[in-house]
Regions:
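Active-site loop-to-helix "anion-binding N-cap" substructures in soluble metabolic enzymes
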Residues: 1-279
């Protein structure tokens, strides 16, 4: 590692630890030095839509990707890079390592957690499943590797409906974890026999139907897109329900110029890049 890059990394650590404000020119210089180091180390950054917009742009500049958790891991498997810097919560790093065991997977911190993951303890969930041995166990990607190991199927929000419909066609009764709202949405959409684990996303669980109704009154021409981790009362008011990637596609293709978005604020950054003419 050359001296300039080493100094830049030390500066970046100091900025992060002490929350020191930086000028735009300093930020560009730091970014370029870190990108040079990443090229030396054959590393790319993969990050989730929910992280800060500056980090999303950095990931793209590194030759990496901004995506949902599954696409992050799939990209990691396909890329020629030897090291994956996964910017997201812990289960995303685990998923990337599962799909690319031969690659080095680095995360900025292992303390970045997801309430769905934390709210589904592997030991407790295993006991829950053992009480219902006749049921097929389906878990959401937003779980630890230990929880995934107890499951028959692992799904993402983009493929969950298709998988549940298939299992229903076989006559399966299902245990779904960890998100009770997503599980409720799947049960209502497919009519499958689903027993839900009592978990929720702390971000989406805060969305309230009455607040959404007030927004719709203020902006009646706006389309409403929400994530299926939202409460049922919010989902019922939406024009479109889908995964983060599907929400972006909907916004790009919609005739509506104004969109009310029901998910983490980080997704707005990519939506504005893909559909800058919309609000």
């Amino acid at each position: 590692m050359n001296i300039n890059i080493e100094k830049s990394l030390e500066k970046a650590r100091e900025i992060n630890q002490k929350r020191i404000p930086v000028s735009p020119s300093e930020l560009v210089s730091l970014k370029n030095d870190i990108l040079d180091l990443m090229r030396e180390e054959k590393a790319v950054m993969v990050c989730h839509y929910y992280v800060d917009g500056v980090i999303q742009d950095f990931a793209v500049d590194s030759g990496g990707i901004v995506a949902d958790s599954l696409e992050m891991a799939k990209f990691g498997k396909k890329t020629a890079a030897e090291t994956l810097i996964v910017v997201g919560v812990r289960f995303m790093g685990e998923t990337a390592k599962i799909l690319s065991p031969e690659k080095k997977v680095i995360m900025p911190t292992l303390k970045a957690t997801c309430s769905l993951d934390v709210g589904c303890d592997a030991g407790l969930f295993k006991k829950f499943c053992e009480k219902n041995p006749e049921k097929t166990v389906v878990v959401y990607a937003n779980t630890s590797a230990a929880v995934k190991a107890t499951a028959d199927w692992t799904v993402t929000s983009s493929c969950a409906v298709k998988i549940i419909e298939y299992l229903k066609s076989r006559g399966d009764k299902i245990i779904f974890a960890p998100d009770k709202h997503l599980g409720g949405y799947l049960k209502k959409t497919t009519g499958a026999d689903i027993t839900n684990w009592d978990g929720h996303c702390v971000v989406h669980d805060e969305f309230k139907a009455f607040e959404l109704m007030q927004l719709k009154k203020r902006i009646p021409e706006a389309s409403v897109v929400v994530h299926p981790e939202s409460p049922a009362s919010v989902i019922d008011l939406a024009d479109f329900v889908g995964s983060t990637s599907d929400m972006i596609k909907y916004v790009m293709q919609s005739d509506s110029k104004k969109i009310i978005v029901g998910t983490d604020n980080g997704l707005i950054h990519m939506m504005k890049k893909k559909a800058p003419e919309k609000i």
